[in-house]
Swiss-Prot record:
The lineage of its organism: Eukaryota, Metazoa, Chordata, Craniata, Vertebrata. Residues 37-516, 588-600, 699-728, 950-954 are extracellular. This is Meckelin. Glycans are attached at N242. Homodimer. Part of the tectonic-like complex (also named B9 complex). Interacts with DNAJB9, DNAJC10 and mutated SFTPC. Interacts with SYNE2 during the early establishment of cell polarity. Interacts (via C-terminus) with FLNA. Interacts with TMEM218. Interacts with WNT5A. Interacts with ROR2. Residues 668-676, 677-685, 686-698, 729-754, 755-759, 760-768, 924-926, 927-933, 934-949 dip into the membrane without crossing it. It is a multi-pass membrane protein. The keyword tRNA processing does not apply. It is linked to A spontaneous deletion of TMEM67 cause the bilateral polycystic kidneys (bpck) phenotype, a disease mimicking human Meckel-Gruber syndrome 3. Homozygous bpck/bpck mice typically manifest bilateral nephropathy with swollen abdomens resulting from grossly enlarged polycystic kidneys and die by 3 week of age. Some mice also develop hydrocephalus, usually detectable within a few days of birth. Additionally, bpck/bpck mice exhibit retinal degeneration and tissue disorganization in the eye, and cochlear defects. Residues 546-555, 629-667, 769-923, 983-992 are cytoplasmic. Disulfide bonds join C49-C62, C65-C78, C80-C97, C100-C114, C117-C127, C129-C150, C153-C170, C173-C184, C186-C197, C237-C246, C253-C268, C354-C375.
Length: 992
């Protein structure tokens, strides 16, 4: 029966359970009970529980203790009240207490039994014994005595024992008591200090200064730690050569910043006294500054010793950028009492107060990686994490050829060290430095007054730690000198530890002697600068000939300076690009280290060169920019009226006949095309900027500018990112910019102009088809001529005749387009005579007497007619000049000499006749953007680099570079258009 009913009962239980679950769920849904109300509970701390409550670590709340119980010292369990002993204890609060009988009111130390006490009870209900006695509750076999006894420890010479601090057993007296007084007491004439007993007959210093000095705050305070332990520690070190005491004395000296004052008997003075007094002892590991039994704190105070330590002996090992390149720094660590803690590697952030991932912290010791870490830490955290300072002696571990492991000590430059009240380590001359050995990170002990349990009044923090690694000059195998650990401490007067903080920095920097590089740069600058002077003189001489001025005046000097600025800009550009690429290639590609990057301070000279290059290139750009928007230009219309076609014109004398005028639309069309090609370039500026930005930011070429040994373009986000080198950023940016620019120019010249569109040659062809020539004067007596005279005689014709003319020209059924018969030369450089220029100016003055082009509807008739007359006069004069009509202002055509082409100047002066030089290279583009692409490309590049050097942001540099390109292009178009309208009488409203 039982077995049959079990399934039914189980089903009933499951049914009732399901019903209850469904009901509960339905109630939750219908009542919309808040989950926050279900899962929230009161917040309790152990210290908030009552005297008879304990903190339940499971329920995280206060719970009552049992009868005759109270909470323990931790607050997480219960103990019996005084006068009660335990009869059951299952752990935690699960205890049962029972009252002791009247004749046995005391409770044993373990709390399980009651006992009769010989001399009173403590507040906890335990037996109490007088000073020097120990409490005995059990016999030798462990049986509980009926009454406890207080036994006096035997202090006689046979035992030398006394009660321990807990009063539970007799222990041997402290050795200094026994050795000094042959007893367990230290009375006159002996001295008791720091729990040790010393004899006055040792003639050791008695007036020890326990003051802790804080130079940054300009204050001193009486350190409880020094007052309590300094004299005892020094005496134990001096008298007994106690190793731990000597280490503790050294720690106290380090806590006082290794400062030494011959007039003050402080920790360092005591250490020096002991060091000098033990000169007869042997040196440790043959190091003259490391005396037996003493810690190695100083390298000595001889002048000039620091440079010998740092720059005389290279480390007997090599370093490379490939393979295992970690610097193995290790430290011997000691606690404040002088106990040796352990050997520990510096990996894991031992000396780095700023928190970070272990991977990033360990990157500080990757050889060749410049490391920089900064943070701000609250004083409350420092007080918790560094309640007691830890002291470190730092070494570099290396192996010899036989794989034997050795240690190389790392000297310390403590910037807070004072020698006879002088901060010698802050001097710029290393010969005055005093190197030390031991460091700590945080000292929150020496700043405590009166009681070591109090919060310190002052805390001393190592806020700046810098590890400097210097490469041996001319090394090929990665040899380095002894690294230098520079440390600076900040003294902080604690007001509110929770609101105060300390700014911490940790850095590793690499350096090498940059003297040779500076000399080579100076030589290159001197040689190229001299060549720039010669080039500028030649350009100035060529300019003087082109303006027809034989005198050297202020304008000549200013012109020379402008040319020199441009040439010197190229010199600085070449030097900076060469220098940048040198560091980029040789630093990143080396395996065995032979060069290291210049430090940020050493980069200032390079940045100055870049700034000079940009400033002078900007001056050259503005010079050319202004020259282009102020050129003299005129369109010569060769078109003549066809036959004697007449038309009726109404005048004052009635209706009369007149010749049909030549259409002006061809001239307007040519003027518009000229206006369009003024800012045509051989590259696409937007493509240039975006492509450069793409390679730098997206592909990751900017990672080559990081100051580490890696040449990878992609970096793991979890890895440490080294700071950027400004030299490498400049090198990478210039290399990418120039490569993209050169590729664009080559593509434009070799493909685009040849197969798609060549706007410069198209303009020359347009002039021929329009029967319009272009006369340009970029200087007073020098300019360019584009011969556009139609070989068909007329260009103002219909479509049929135009196509017929093109067909005849394609089939060579007409003469060639050149100025000289049977030639194709249409473009010329021209050097005009002064007489011709004067005649041009007389006509031009009439042409430009008005402030602007004629406003067709609003200008007065007389002004308009004068302009028309001047226009026709100029057109007639230039046309007749080209046709050799004026024998007194004639010209001849010749080829330029090779040397003239190379130097960019003319040897012959146009004295009586003007000179037309054949120009197949269309050099008239020099008055356009097109012919100054190199200047524009370098100016844009330098602008890009200067912005990046200032902001360290390629995106911002790209945006501002494109913005300035567009601004100058707009100004060039606008002002150039106005100049074109003014010089050619083409109404600006028709320039679209």
């Amino acid at each position: 029966m039982v077995t049959r009913t079990r399934p039914v009962a189980a089903m009933a239980v499951r049914s009732r359970s399901s019903s209850r679950t469904g009901t509960a769920y339905l109630l939750l849904v219908l009542c919309e009970v808040s989950w926050a109300q279900i899962f929230s509970f009161p917040f309790r701390r152990p210290e908030t529980c009552d005297f008879n409550q304990y903190f339940d670590i499971s329920a995280l709340s206060c719970a009552p203790c049992g009868a005759n119980q109270r909470r323990d010292a931790l607050g997480t369990s219960c103990v019996c009240l005084p006068g009660y002993h335990m009869i059951s204890n299952n752990g935690g609060p699960s205890i049962i207490c029972k009252k002791c009988p009247e004749n046995m009111k005391g409770v044993t130390k373990d709390g399980w039994d009651c006992i009769s006490c010989p001399s009173g009870l403590t507040a906890e209900g335990k037996c109490h014994c007088p000073t020097g006695h120990i409490l005995v509750e059990r016999n030798v076999s462990g049986s509980l005595l009926a009454q406890a006894t207080c036994e006096l420890c035997d202090e006689s010479e046979n035992s030398f024992t006394k009660a321990n601090a807990l009063g539970t057993r007799c222990v041997r007296c402290e050795p200094t008591f026994v050795n000094t007084s042959r007893s367990c007491s230290c009375s006159e004439p002996h001295t008791l200090t720091g729990g040790l007993c010393f004899s006055n007959t040792g003639n050791f210093h008695q007036r020890v200064i326990s003051t802790a000095r804080y130079g940054e705050l300009g204050m001193s305070l009486n350190s409880e730690w020094f007052a309590k332990y300094l004299q005892a520690t020094a005496a134990a070190c001096w008298t007994h050569a106690n190793l731990t005491s000597c280490q503790a004395l050294g720690n106290m000296c380090v806590m006082n910043m290794n400062s030494y004052d011959s007039t003050t008997l402080d920790a360092c003075r005591l250490f020096h006294y002991i060091f000098e007094s033990t000169a007869g002892l042997i040196s440790v590991h043959s190091v003259p500054f490391w005396r037996q039994n003493l810690p190695w704190l100083f390298y000595g105070d001889q002048p000039g010793l620091a440079p010998q330590v740092l720059s005389t002996t290279p480390l007997p090992t090599n370093f490379s950028f490939k393979g295992q390149n970690q610097l193995k720094f290790v430290a011997a660590s000691y606690d404040i009492r002088g106990n040796f803690i352990k050997w520990q590697p510096l990996e894991g952030g031992v000396l780095q107060l700023c928190p970070d991932t272990e991977r990033r912290l360990d990157a500080a010791y990757a050889f060749g990686t410049t490391y920089q870490q900064n943070c701000e830490i609250s004083l409350s955290k420092l007080l918790v994490d560094f309640s007691s300072p830890v002291f470190y002696d730092v070494y570099l571990e290396y192996t010899d050829e036989e794989q034997h492991r050795y240690l190389w000590p790392i000297p310390v430059l403590n910037l807070n060290l004072q020698h006879n009240k002088l901060f010698v380590n802050q001097d710029s001359s290393s010969s005055k430095w005093l190197l030390t050995r031991r460091i700590f990170l945080v000292d929150a002990v020496s700043g405590r007054e009166n009681d070591l349990g109090n919060q310190p009044r002052v805390i001393r923090v190592a806020t700046q730690i810098s590890l400097s690694i210097r490469l041996v000059p001319n090394t090929k195998n990665g040899n380095i000198y002894t690294p230098l650990l520079t440390i600076a401490y900040s003294d902080i007067d604690i007001k509110n530890a929770h609101s105060q903080s300390a700014k911490i920095s940790f850095s590793v920097k690499y350096e090498m002697n940059q003297g040779d590089a500076s000399v080579h740069t100076d030589i290159a600058l001197g040689v190229l600068g001299g060549l720039a002077v010669l080039s500028s003189l030649l350009k100035t001489a060529g300019w003087k000939r082109r303006v027809g001025s034989p005198m050297i005046d202020l304008q000549t000097v200013m012109k020379f300076l402008l040319y020199y600025a441009g040439d010197l800009a190229n010199v600085f550009f070449i030097i900076t690009v060469g220098t940048g690429l040198y560091w980029l290639i040789f630093f990143k590609a080396q395996k065995s280290v032979s060069v290291l990057l210049p430090m940020p301070v050493q980069e200032e000279r390079f940045v100055t060169y870049v700034g000079c290059a940009f400033a002078m290139k900007a001056l050259q750009f503005l010079h050319k920019f202004i020259s282009q928007i102020s050129i003299d230009i005129f369109f010569i219309d060769w078109e003549r009226p066809k036959g004697k076609v007449l038309k009726a014109v109404e005048g004052e004398g009635g209706v009369r006949s007149a010749t049909v005028p030549v259409s002006i639309w061809r001239t307007y069309f040519v003027a518009n095309e000229w206006n369009e090609i003024q800012t045509v370039r051989k590259i696409n500026p937007l493509f240039q900027v975006l492509t450069t930005l793409f390679f730098l930011e997206v592909v990751g070429f900017k990672n080559l500018a990081l100051m580490d040994s890696s040449s990878s373009l992609s970096r793991n986000p979890s890895d440490y990112t080294a700071p950027y080198s400004r030299i490498l950023r400049y090198a990478v940016a210039t290399a990418i910019w120039l490569v993209i620019g050169i590729i664009q120019v080559v593509f434009f010249a070799a493909f685009y102009e040849r197969f798609i569109e060549d706007k410069i040659r198209q303009f020359v062809d347009l002039c021929s088809m329009s029967n319009v020539s272009v006369f340009l004067l970029s200087h007073r007596c020098f300019g360019y001529y584009i011969h556009g005279r139609s070989v068909h005689g007329h260009a103002d014709t219909n479509m049929e005749e135009m196509n017929m003319n093109l067909k005849r020209e394609a089939e060579n059924l007409c003469s060639q387009r050149g100025l000289v018969p049977n030639t194709d030369g249409q473009t010329f450089q021209i050097a005009v005579s002064s007489q011709m220029r004067q005649h041009y100016d007389r006509i031009h003055e009439t042409l430009t007497r008005r402030n602007g082009p004629a406003r067709l509807l609003s200008s007065s008739g007389s002004t308009f007619e004068q302009s028309i007359k001047a226009y026709h006069a100029m057109n007639k004069f230039l046309g007749s000049f080209i046709d050799h009509v004026h024998k007194e202002m004639d010209y001849f055509i010749k080829d330029k000499l090779l040397l003239e082409r190379i130097l960019g100047m003319e040897f012959m002066e146009p004295m009586e006749k003007s000179i037309f030089y054949n120009d197949e290279g269309h050099s008239f583009s020099s008055v356009l953007y097109y012919g100054n692409e190199a200047t524009l490309l370098i100016f844009d590049l330098l602008f890009f680099c200067v912005v990046d050097l200032a902001c360290q942001d390629f995106v911002l540099a790209s945006f501002l570079t494109y913005l300035q390109q567009e601004i100058f292009r707009f100004i060039r178009n606008t002002v150039g258009q106005k100049n074109l309208a003014t010089k050619t009488l083409v109404d600006e409203r028709f320039l679209i």
